[in-house]
UniProtKB/Swiss-Prot annotation:
Presence of the UniProt keyword Transferase in the record: yes
Pathway as given in its UniProt record: Pyrimidine metabolism; UMP biosynthesis via de novo pathway; UMP from orotate: step 1/2
Catalytic reaction(s) noted: orotidine 5'-phosphate + diphosphate = orotate + 5-phospho-alpha-D-ribose 1-diphosphate
Role description: Catalyzes the transfer of a ribosyl phosphate group from 5-phosphoribose 1-diphosphate to orotate, leading to the formation of orotidine monophosphate (OMP).
Listed InterPro entries: OPRT (IPR023031), Or_phspho_trans_dom (IPR004467), PRibTrfase_dom (IPR000836), PRTase-like (IPR029057)
Annotated protein name in UniProt: Orotate phosphoribosyltransferase
EC number: 2.4.2.10
Keyword set includes Transferase: yes
Originating organism: Dichelobacter nodosus (strain VCS1703A)
Single biological process term from Gene Ontology: pyrimidine ribonucleoside biosynthetic process
Cofactor(s) in the UniProt record: Mg(2+)
Any Pfam family matching the protein: Pribosyltran
Subunit: Homodimer.
Length: 221
């Protein structure tokens, strides 16, 4: 059964065309029966729904994992961390700092690679929309190491739960294992399939089941 924030998130994603069902060719070359584009959450109402969903996940994680700063990789992570920080404070009375990186180092003014809160010596939670190759997130980890920060985890919007290479690990699980970090997602492929089933879309569900049989991890993590 989906949580209320998950249902609201998926309903908003459908309404915004952030979530589409059909035939899509991914960057990996795989032919997927669904497509997710977080950039379509591009107005105040949609951003609010998305950041409140992130906040729900992070508030639960915060109960067992100390977090000082939310970090959003530029550019997509910038509005996310700002909105999530607000949602955490208003909904859960959790007051976290937030920061993001510059794409290019600034040599004048305040300078540096980081904008926002200082991350030095802080427990930092990374936030991004999806994790595929993970290039931006890994670059962020390298930058945070230079800044003497202490990364504690990563939260994304969608975990596709697809195998990476010859392993039976998803991209998110592989990232967790490689970096010894906590990882969470608002929605997993399992959650999405539950939503599709409850929405009365048997044809779509059948295609998703077939897709997962080929590319999905054996068990949900």
């Amino acid at each position: 059964m989906l949580a209320v924030y998950q249902t609201r998130f998926l309903e908003a994603a459908l309404a915004a065309d952030a979530l589409k069902f059909g035939e899509f060719t991914l960057k990996s070359g795989r032919h997927s029966p669904y497509f997710f584009n977080a950039a379509a959450f591009c107005n105040g109402k949609l951003l609010s729904v998305m950041t409140e969903a992130y906040a729900a996940v992070i508030a639960e994680l915060h109960e067992t994992c100390a977090i000082d700063v939310l970090f959003g990789p530029a550019y997509k992570g910038i509005p996310l961390v700002a909105g999530i920080a607000q949602a955490l404070f208003h909904r859960y009375d959790i007051n976290l700092a937030w920061a993001f990186n510059r794409k290019e180092t600034k040599t004048h003014g305040e300078g540096g690679n980081i904008v926002g809160a200082s991350v030095a010596g802080k427990k930092v939670l990374l936030v991004d929309d999806v994790l595929t190759a993970g290039t931006a997130v890994r670059q962020s980890l390298a930058l945070l190491a230079q800044e003497q920060a202490m990364p504690v985890g990563l939260v994304i919007a969608l975990d596709r739960q697809e195998k990476v290479g010859d392993s039976n690990l998803s991209a998110l699980k592989q990232f967790s294992v490689e970096n010894q970090l906590q990882t969470r997602a608002i929605i997993t492929l399992d959650d999405l399939m539950t939503f599709v089933k409850e929405s009365g879309k048997p044809a779509v569900l059948e295609k998703m089941q077939a897709y997962r049989k080929i590319y999905g991890i054996s068990e949900a993590d």
